[in-house]
Amino acid sequence: PDWDLFESGSLYRPMQGKIWRAVGFETQRGCPYTCTFCNSPSNNVEYKAETGGKFHRKKSIARMKKELDFLVKKYDPNLIYFVVDTFLAMSNREFDELKELYSDYKIPFWMNTRAETINEYRAAGLAEMNMLRMNIGIEHGNYDYRRNYLKRNVKNEVQIRAFQIAAEHD
C-alpha cells in the first residue's frame, strides 16, 4: 500500500514501551475458519456467491517480496504489522517459504493467530524471523461456551500449551 495520502505521523505506533515506525502488510486476505463472531465466514459466502471463488486468498511469495521491497524502500519501517486474521493459517511449506523470504528483512513484527496454529517448529521459526509480539485469539475461557456458541472447538489444553510454547521462544 501507498500511504502518501496520510500524514507521515500516522505511521508511528506505540508498542511495548517504544514508538515504532510501523507499516501494515498482508500475506493473505480472509480466513479459512468459521467462527460465529467474525465477519470472514459471511465474506466467504458473499464472495463465493458473487464470484464463484474463495474469499480466503494467499499472496504468492513473489508478490509478498515485491510489496515488502516497496514498503521497506519507501517507508523504512522498524516494525511490520502482519494484517492477517490468522497469520499462521498456512502449511509448513508455506511457512518455510515465508520464513526464507523474511530472512532478507528481519524487521521486528507482530501478528495475530489462533492457538491451534502454534507448535514448537513454528514458534522457533517466528523467533528466527524476529517476531516482537504475537496476539493469540482465545475469545473465551470456557471450552463449552467456545465450542457451542463461538464454533471454536479448541480444548483449553491446546490454548494453554500455545502460550507455553510462545513463552519458551520469547
Indicate where each model-derived feature is located.
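Radical SAM [4Fe-4S] cluster-binding motif and immediate context
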Residues: 2-169
